[in-house]
Amino acid sequence: MEELQTISTLQGVEIALRKELEHIAEGYIKVGYLLKKTRDAEFYKEKGYADVFEFAKETFNISRTWAIRFMQINDTYSIDGNSPEIQEKYRGYGSSKLSEMLALPEEVREVVPRDATVREIREVKEVI
């Protein structure tokens, strides 16, 4: 935290933000993994929830839409499609880009550069 307080240039801010956004993306992978684990092992039943979506909503205020998105992000970008670790090729994209890229075919996702903006990814989605 102290290192953030010493940033004194725009470039320093950009570097720090990229690092933090990467951590958020990795968090999405982990949240998706834990939700899938809860769903697959039916852990939600331990507290009487009907499904993983009710558990996520009641416990963490995660909507069904976001729970599905977290699990899709894990399916798509985690190692072997079911792990708490992001695939190396998707490191550095950030959570917003990964979320936008979900709708792209795999062959298109594979060629989206890390420095593409969310706006550029949306433009590609419109063309496809």
Language-model features and meaning:
Residues 72:
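Positions that flank functional sites
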